[in-house]
Amino acid sequence: MLSIDIVGLTGACSYALDCIEAELVNIKNKHGKRVAYISIRMAEYWKIQGDELQDLAMCALLHDNALTQYISEELKKDSVIDLKKDLSEEKTNLHCIYGEKNITKLPFKTDVTNVILYHHEHADGTGPFQKKWNEIPLFARIIHLADIIDIIRNSIDSDDNSWDFMCQYLSKNKDSLFDSECVNAFLHVFTKESFMCLSDDSFETKLWKAIPREKLVFDWEMCKDVADFFAKIVDYKSSFTSRHSIGVAEKASMLAQYMGYDSITVQKMYLAGALHDIGKMAVGNEILEKPDKLTDDEFSKMKNHAGYTYLILSEVNDFEEIRDWAAFHHEKLNGKGYPFGKTAAELNEPERMMACVDIYQALTEDRPYKKGLSHEKTCDILDDMAQKDFIDSDISKIIRECFGRNR
């Protein structure tokens, strides 16, 4: 059984989602964490604690978990979409539907049914699903208000007048956009001073101190569900890498099992594989999907994705091993890999395995601009890379055996 800091992992995913929102809809970084912080502060009004508080925080951190999926689905219909319009009006319900479905397999301790689905509903029933406030879960109502508060805070100047503006906005939209109970809760726990503090990073320390961060013990199925949830978010970022993270996760765990590793390590390899490209959430699609050769500057930004993976996963308590297996997948034995320039002496076997599996998966999978290579051709390329001291020759040989079975 694998023990995981699920709140920390959720926070790490929130950071990655925030990078997408900053890129596409001009919402500054840490939006998800601010929504979570505002939500748990409002929870004080109802004296929400323990498991309920943790689940509220997780829902708030993941309230826009389907953003990349929504964009991917819409781009299949239309090569150009107006995100600022579509994400706020008639198609808002789509990312709510996707998001609600996505979280069903996450290990919540309480009932969070319809929290993500209805987090854009209006108190007067004019929202996407036309639910009135008394038909909407409390957590959804809290997150809705917190979400709008942070979006507006992001769009106005943070000065002495911003608090007065926010109070006037809430008063104007009370019982229409927001229910009176949630408005009262916000005004009960926030003052001008605490509201102004949302503009700096001090709120984040307070957020992590306030949320219970008990580790959860995962069996294989739970681990796979959580890993697949995060991999899905990453893979929807770009049509060029659809299912890449899932493929790496499956093959990394298969290889670990074939090489005789214990069940915990097999689970860790699956999770590391699912998360290895989470740093790509911080890289713009104009680079990820550029059909032409990248410029030196663009390639430098692309190489940063593994460093972002390291940075993002560093937020998770006691996750160093999985973080390193995930983040070092572009390192080379000769020290000429990236982003850290690790040498053979600094790369353990699981890290070497992940590097090999990532290359194998990238070469064998179909992409919009190329057909995947055969197993034999891919293994020949791996052998050539091993001879050049890029990757581990022993692992390259084992991959030929392991992935060549039943072909």
Task: Write out the residue ranges for each language-model feature.
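Histidine- and acidic-residue-rich, metal-dependent catalytic cores
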Residues: 2-407
